[in-house]
Amino acid sequence: MKLFAYFLSFLLLISGCSKNDNTNQPLPDTMYFPPLSGNEWETVSVADLSWNQNAVQPLKDFLIQKNTMAFMILVNGRIVMEEYFNGHTPSAGWEWNSAGKTLVATTTGIAQQEGLLSINDKASDFLGTGWTNMSLAKENLITVRNLLTMTSGIDDANQLVIKPNLTYVADAGTRWAYGNVFQKLTDVVSVAGNTDFETYFNEKLKNKTGMDGYWNFGTIFTIYHSTARSMARFGILALNKGKWNNEQIVDEQFFTESINTSQNINPSYGYL
């Protein structure tokens, strides 16, 4: 998976970037938030950080070998490295793939803090009775939280999220399985906010962080597309626990919950 290659590349760079004992340059310890529009973005160099400059080219070679499209490293919001490969450009979009689930979770958290829903609400409060192919008793066990934590108990064998495929395997909360039924959260937010999901997402998250991009609501996958810089913007939001500049865009408690164990079946999983 490409996202794994990006992450592995980042780890390799960090492990290869040693400090120079003869240089004592101060780190840019103040957090920087790029302007919401335009291409202005502060940078800091590898040399300024006293990182290992000799490791940069081997890293680039590795990224090319792994068919990487875009690669960025930020320190406190400032760009240290920004590289594009294999014909990709700064203005070109790319799929977030599974990382887009984090955007869905964050948007759900914003809807909760605005009082539009509680993640403890039944999913059927928003999706209506009969949104699954399960008995009513079993369907009513599924909460918004279950969709966030992959514990709906719905059969994950078929990734096409249509009613005939949403069949019972286990009671909600008793089984963890990675699947596409999380996509129903976009419908939950849409109903709760009385608008379509993308409009709500744009207003509450995308525009407030200066991201670009769009959602592709396909028959199997719901995928966000954007530039690498937009993904970096979301990274800055995450680094600051849901805060952008002086605005708490997503509740810090929800953000903390989302990156910690959310249930006792798969302790490695938070919210999407």
Question: Predicted regions span which residues?
Answer:
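Bacterial Sec-dependent N-terminal signal peptides
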Residues: M1-P26
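N-terminal leader/targeting segments and the immediately adjacent pre-domain N-terminus
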Residues: C17-T89, W94, Q112-L117, T149, ...
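Second-shell loop/turn segments in exported
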Residues: V44-A47, P90-E95, T132-S135, V169-R175, ...
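Non-transmembrane alpha-helical segments in soluble domains
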Residues: K60, G109, S124, R145-T149, ...
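Structural recognition of the beta-strand scaffold that forms the well-ordered cores
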Residues: A70-L74, I79-E82, N97, N146-T149, ...
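Active-site SXXK
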Residues: G77, W94-N120, L147, K184-V189, ...
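Active-site helix/loop module of the DD-peptidase/beta-lactamase fold
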Residues: E114-S152, G193-T227
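Penicillin-binding protein/beta-lactamase superfamily catalytic region
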Residues: A170, K206-L272
